[in-house]
Amino acid sequence: MSSTNKKIAIIGAGVAGLLAAVTAADRGAKVMLFEKMPKVGLKMGITGKGRCNLTNSAPIMDFIGNTPGNGKFLYSAYEAFSNIDLLELLHGYGLVTKVERGGRVFPASDDAQEVRHLFMRLLKEKKVELHLEEPVSHIVVIDGRAKGVVTKKGRYDADAVILTTGGASYPRTGSTGDGYRMAGEIGHKITTIRPALIPLVTKESWPKDLQGLSLKNVTLSLSAGGRRKAEEFGEMLFTHFGITGPIVLSLSDKASLWLSQGHPVEATLDLKPALTQEILDKRVLRDLEKHHLKQMSGALVELLPHRMIDVVLSLAGIPRDLPVSELKKAQRASLVQTMKSMKLTITGTRPIEEAIVTAGGISVKEVNPSTMESKKVAGLYFAGEVLDIHAFTGGYNLQAAFSTGHLAAESAAGRDA
């Protein structure tokens, strides 16, 4: 542990800000942590459906691949503080973790509040000066160097400032985009803000009829301007406004981008991706022969979830009360085609306030990836979602926040003012 005696102001007590505060204090800096909300780590408390998906157990190179938003910018941050380093740190402070499907790492307690309380304890132990309900209005810059912050209570001088205010999603946790304004005021470019990892809204109303129905082992593909662009296999969920669930969230970043560019976006749902059209036709024929005395609505119970049957028949143009014995070959072909290719028109995303993460932010071209320091203002550092970085679900976003927070704090505490 070094003793820098530096004074560091950190704006925002989310994931990145909390680890930055702990890291800087460990390096001997005097840390002032400013948070506009009454509590620290509020977004941390709701991540992973309240369980806190801390990170992923995947090799660190997989993190780059799972970060469509400027993943390569994070090489140095991950090298300085990897998922292994994070877990070593947390385990050392007594947190017990577990690994679940897809390498997702959670607290063994399944309680995000345990992680939040751990950081609250560390702030106290490391004598971090915590300023709750004290939003920063702007960053003080003198002769091209960050020299402090201003709040409603006055000016606080500092040798370095770390901006960790988060994105624009989940505003009730304090993420309202304040950091974009502050960075923009001192000359930083803010790339267009849009939602990422967000449910999608459909033009068609039939998803509403299936509200609450979850599908597993299906394929959803997206096309923009008539060309297929992306595809995911896994689980999804119908809602009153459209579709959500893991594969929808993974594809939503691309859908959000294409919609913002004015491209028409269409989704295609394959209910039976493991079967070719020919094999599925044989399977349908077998089931129809088995249930030849029934109506069509009762003949597909072994092929489709009960609630899907009427929707699929309607889209295929087949009356639900049609006797199986009267089904024409062309109608059967339409049924098979519908199951392999259910079309949905994507008209938009849910509001950015509902996004799991925000795409866009402070341009990484103006930030040194080796230190997280601004290329425009000396002594100013950035970390977390305020930067133009975003990743898929699975613990990748929190690790990016932890890693950039750690690197920013090490750089700020270890350099001469």
What spans do the regions from the language model cover?
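Glycine-rich loop(s) and the adjacent beta-strand/alpha-helix scaffold that form part
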Residues: 160-206
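Glycine-rich active-site loop/strand segments that organize a redox cofactor
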Residues: 51-99
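Glycine-rich FAD pyrophosphate-binding loop
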Residues: 25-49
